[in-house]
Amino acid sequence: MKAVESNFDGLVGPTHNYSGLSVGNIASKSNQSGVSNPKQAVKQGLEKMKALHDMGFVQGVLAPQERPDIHTLRRLGFSGSDSEVLKKSYQYSPQLLAACSSASSMWTANAGTVSPSADTTDGKVHFTPANLINKFHRSIEDQVTGNILKATFSDEKHFVHHEALPHSDYFGDEGAANHTRFCREYGEQGVEFFVFGKSAFNESYLAPKKYPARQTLEASEAIARTHGLREQFTVFAQQNPDVIDRGVFHNDVIAVGNKNTLFCHQQAFLNQEKVKSDLCASYGSGFNVIEVPTDKVSVQDAVETYLFNSQLITKADGTTLIILPEHCRQNSRVWAYLNELIEQKRGIDELHTFDLKQSMQNGGGPACLRLRVVLNEAEQKAVNQHTLMSEELFTTLNLWADKHYRDRIEDKDLADSQLLVESRSALDELTQIMHLGSIYPFQK
């Protein structure tokens, strides 16, 4: 059966704001306390989804989290009505309210790790939500993320859903942002590539000194076991600790892969020559590494433009397209390198840029916004069809955003009880549009 690599992008939630919550993410911290535009953000995301749909790709939509997260604020000791909980939390700990109001679930590369049926011993697609324990504001996502994934991929004949790994630093897991897959054809056995920042149990591994390593070797190994992956087609590699300390908080900020191609920076991995050798050994002949030299693109330029936080996708005619943030065009060194790369015909054939300013200012580019899910024909039919991008869904979701989303949010607005009402109303309607059922705590 012919398989495709679909992309499921996260809808930006109604509380999209710039609270600078992500230590190690330079863009997030540098735009702290700025004024956000949730309506523009959700529409920018929808435009990208629609563009990929129009190019002929299978494009899905994943719902956002319920925010502000009143349930978590109550667990942390704030009581009274929902309005009082918001008021008290803003009065005593505005940082906590900001964390419980984050729309960071838009970056579905962190939603979880997905292994296609061609790679798993039981022949089913496996999903594990990421525990995201390194950042409090993201560590409260995995239960609802699991609900959203189950409502989107519900057929137990084809899909297996696991719980997130234990909420412990030993098993810190950041999902598909540290995972990619190489293959000849999407429906054939592939090589799954897990990248970690540190080992929790083995102190002989190097670790970054300035910023945290969010993914552990132990977490990556646990997911490979849970998904039933074949050892000879599974490769583990350590991210270069030095680039983590320079703002490369996930591997997808310094490398991206698709089919037979790894597009990475010269300084992406520790022992990079061995990593390339291991991948070539698992993949076999024809593996293509495009390694960007530091003298062409510095790590700083890579982080500032999100060159590698791009999408490498293969079109129906076999050509490879790279989806880039507009920031890449605006950097003369990066743009010159990319055009040189196209001219050299080394495996990337076309460039396509998108304006994702609202997401980029919070530290997330095109690759952050999507979760890749390889599906064969039967699995495609088993997906909740109301979550797949179409002309109708694009129009409906734009009208939905116009109805429910604000065009301006600053820190103090998070304490506004009306924002909670607006957010819940939006999500309640969204679950009906996308036939998701009662996936949110307020709907129980």
From Swiss-Prot:
Molecular function GO terms recorded: N-succinylarginine dihydrolase activity
Give the reactions, separated by semicolons, that this protein catalyses: N(2)-succinyl-L-arginine + 2 H2O + 2 H(+) = N(2)-succinyl-L-ornithine + 2 NH4(+) + CO2
> Per UniProt, where does substrate bind?
19-28, 110, 137-138, 214, 252, 362
Hydrolase recorded as keyword:
yes
- Top-level EC class as recorded in UniProt: hydrolase
What residue ranges are annotated as transmembrane? Answer: none
Q: What is this protein called?
A: N-succinylarginine dihydrolase
Q: Please name the gene that encodes this protein.
A: astB
